[in-house]
């Protein structure tokens, strides 16, 4: 399978608080790089003889596939969310209030988690726990989680 770089869905020149140069660079280098990297890893996996390949090779490629895939998907969700009004819809507001008490408490915690991401590389996501029936912030390295799909809980927040 070959992955394609999606068209940037917002106009970077019209975003408030983010420079056009920053958005274009992040889109081309980080997102575009993740897609290219995922395609390279996919090609390696397609040509790999799993019956004879050493376990560490399989493990390494599958780990890198997971990281690149999540990076691609999370960047797509991020860029698709830019240019909106920044306010959660009523259903999301209700869910946040139910889980955190009020929007301000959630926003304070969410922003603090973003500032705590070391080196400026990583994500903070608002996810939904089906087990606990609550919204939960998750930070740091969600690239290492099982693959996200637009149908997963994170799509609810885009």
What is the predicted function of each stretch?
Residues 1-158:
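Feature for soluble, non-membrane regions of globular proteins
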């Amino acid at each position: 399978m070959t992955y394609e770089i999606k068209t940037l869905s917002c106009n970077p020149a019209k975003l408030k608080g983010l420079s056009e140069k920053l958005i274009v660079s992040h889109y081309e280098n980080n997102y575009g790089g993740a897609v290219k990297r995922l395609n390279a890893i996919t090609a390696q996996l397609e040509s790999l003889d799993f019956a004879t390949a050493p376990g560490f090779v399989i493990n390494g490629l599958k780990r890198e596939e997971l990281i690149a895939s999540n990076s691609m998907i999370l960047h797509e969700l991020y860029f698709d969310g830019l240019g909106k009004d920044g306010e959660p819809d009523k259903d999301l507001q209700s869910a946040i209030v139910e889980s955190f008490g009020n929007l301000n408490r959630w926003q304070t915690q969410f922003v603090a988690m973003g500032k705590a991401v070391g080196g400026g590389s990583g994500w903070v996501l608002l996810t939904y726990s089906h087990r606990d029936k609550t919204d939960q912030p998750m930070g740091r390295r969600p690239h290492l989680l099982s693959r996200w799909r637009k149908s997963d809980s994170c799509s609810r927040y885009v």
